[in-house]
Amino acid sequence: MRKIDPKVDEAIQTLNIKDGPTRRKLLGGAGLVSATAAASALLAACSSSSSSAAGSTIGSFPKTPAWKFYFVNHVTTNAFFTPTQYGMNDAAALLGLPNPVWSGSDNQVISQMTSAFDTAVAAGAAGIALAAISSTAFTSHVTNAMNKGIPVVTYNADGEYVNGQPQIGTNRLCYVGQSLYVSGQSMGAQIKTLVPGGGDIVIFIPQAGTGNTQPRFDGAKAALGSSYTVAEIATGAEQSVEPAAMKAYLLAHKSSLKGAFAVDAGDTQFLGPQLKSLGMSIPAGGFDTTGETVPNIQSGTLDFTIYQDPYLQGFMPVLYLYLYNISGGVLQPPDTDTGLSVITKSNVGPYVAQSRYQGSTTAEKYIQRPAGAINAPMASTST
């Protein structure tokens, strides 16, 4: 098999050249030098065309300024948000825009988040996506941005819940993320199936009171009712300290616990290994698909995890901010529930593949879905 020149391969991949005369000429043209030169010319033409406008065009969309969007996050280095960053960058590439700025705090420090938000406003951001983990801390900041004509959407967290009712606290345009209280209720339903009749259980949470995880705990506890004694154990906002805090509690209550669960990606991925290290075989589950969570579902160490699609939480805000800007504000971004899929050993198969959508690889690749019937429950909600 003839070796393909790197420049030729780059042109084919970058320009997505399908099978046809151009592709055949590049792969088997009149010699390596001419093929390489042609590939270089194609890449140069593409680069020149893209840079001649502030923002390049996709399909029949008009040329736009190079809109710079900003994402403000509460745990910027957390592995859960790796696919979120891939999603925002992929959407920007699709629309011919620069990669959004990823900023905020790496351990849920509100002052660092508001500082990052204000920096985006001062920079004249074309739009801001905010993980609003508080219903009060961001109110004036979001209002200020909106008053300056900067559209703001929230993702992953949208304020807090009080007695099961949302307290949003900002005049953002829309929320892109999971319905957090409802997802907690779903967790409660799973727990009741696994631990029938009640008893002592623990639910680990990184930091009590924050809008991204507290609603899940509250929803789960409400669904469980009085027959369960539910311990809420905070393990810390930084993933490096979570396993030790978790192990200490499990060890101290090993004889009485009937189940162990978690409301975030970090605690969930550490839960399986901690149970295994202590020789504990009790019902367990949590949220998301990071780290060892999927292998632990496969092995049966964890019974379930609830998936919320972090890739969409990066992709959709960029798309919505783009459409809002390009339409003159006519295309108002809609609230978007990114999902509540309960993953168990019986349906974990599709989540095993390495992909950008799960944050497990940087490779941009098409993943063929399984052939056959699409198994989905009967729809029960609608807008």
Question: Positions of the model-derived regions?
Answer:
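Flexible loop/hinge segments that line or gate small-molecule binding clefts
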Residues: 136, 140-182, 290-298, 302-303
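Hydrophobic alpha-helical segments within soluble ligand-binding/sensing domains
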Residues: 62, 112-113, 174-201, 242-244, ...
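Bacterial lipoprotein signal-peptidase II cleavage site
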Residues: 47-54
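Hinge/cleft segment of the Venus flytrap/periplasmic-binding protein
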Residues: 55-66, 204, 212, 223-227, ...
